[in-house]
Swiss-Prot record:
It comes from the Eukaryota. GO terms for cellular component: mitochondrion. Pfam families: PET117. Keywords: Mitochondrion, Transit peptide. Its main location: mitochondrion. It comes from Mus musculus. Transmembrane segments: none annotated. The keyword Transit peptide applies. The keyword Electron transport does not apply. Belongs to the PET117 family. The gene is Pet117. It is found in: Mitochondrion. This is Protein PET117 homolog, mitochondrial. Residues 1-22 form a transit peptide.
Amino acid sequence: MSRSSKAVLGLSVLLTAATVAGVHLKQRQDRQRLRDGVIRDIERQNQKKENIRLLGEQIILTKQLEAEREKMLEKGSQNT
């Protein structure tokens, strides 16, 4: 084999190996990004559930406060 043939063969083997390695790295990054996305989605769902629970508590507390205010206003108007 001539020197130029060996050089071309070596270069093509090198480029092929680099391409295969690049594809594997890209796939690994994509899989990790997908896993991270699932974890973020689960965290968002948990946060949403917590926000809904807190909103429910706030609604209950607001109703209790309004009921107490009504009682206080009724007592105040009865005393005058």
